[in-house]
Curated annotation (Swiss-Prot):
Taxonomy of the source species: Bacteria, Pseudomonadati, Pseudomonadota, Gammaproteobacteria, Vibrionales
SUPFAM superfamilies: VC0467-like
Disulfide bond positions: none
Organism: Vibrio parahaemolyticus serotype O3:K6 (strain RIMD 2210633)
GO annotations of cellular component type: cytosol
Stored HAMAP family: UPF0301
InterPro entries: AlgH-like (IPR003774)
Descriptive protein name: UPF0301 protein VP2612
Family, per entry: Belongs to the UPF0301 (AlgH) family.
One Pfam family named in its UniProt record: DUF179
Amino acid sequence: MNLTNHFLVAMPGMKDPYFQNSVIYVCEHNEEGAMGLMINAPVDITVGNMLKQVDVQPVHPRLFEASLDRPVYNGGPISEDRGFILHKPKDYYESSIQMTDDLAVTTSRDILSVLGTEAEPSDYLVALGYSGWSAGQLENELVENSWLTIEATPEIIFDTPITERWKKAVEKLGIDPSQLSADAGHA
C-alpha cells in the first residue's frame, strides 16, 4: 500500500486533538514512513505577512497582491519553521517534486520570490511544518481506524473552502459525514 498523493481524513474518533478534523495531503509514503501536509489548518498569518517576515524580495513586480492575502497553513507539528508550498506546476524551482500532472511540492525559497507576481503558480498553498510517521506508524493508525484514505484531488486543496475540506473529502468517498461514528469497530 502506497498512500503518496492521497488524503488522510481524520475519523471523528481521532484521539490526538492536534489532528482532529484534519485533512492531510500525503507527499511521501514508503517502507521508511510517511510525510504529509495538513491542508485545512490555517494559522493567523497571511502569505504576504510571512514574506515580509522572511524578507523575500519579488523577482517581478507584485501585481497580484490579493493572492498574498491567503492564509498560511499549519502543515504539522514537525519542523514548524520550515516551509512547504503545494502548488500547480508552472515553472521549475530549485527543490520541487512533481507529484502528479496537476500538483507539485516545493521547499526552496525561489518559489517565494514569485508569489504575488505574474510568475506565481495558478494555485498554491503555503504550509509551515509537516506531519510525519515512522515506519509502520501510519499503517497502525489506519488499523486503529484513525484515518480514512482517498486519492487526492487539486479541487479539494485549491477550490474548496477551508472549512469544507474535511466534509468534501469524506463525501468524495461516498460517505455521509453525519453517519461516521467516533467508535471504532472491526468486522
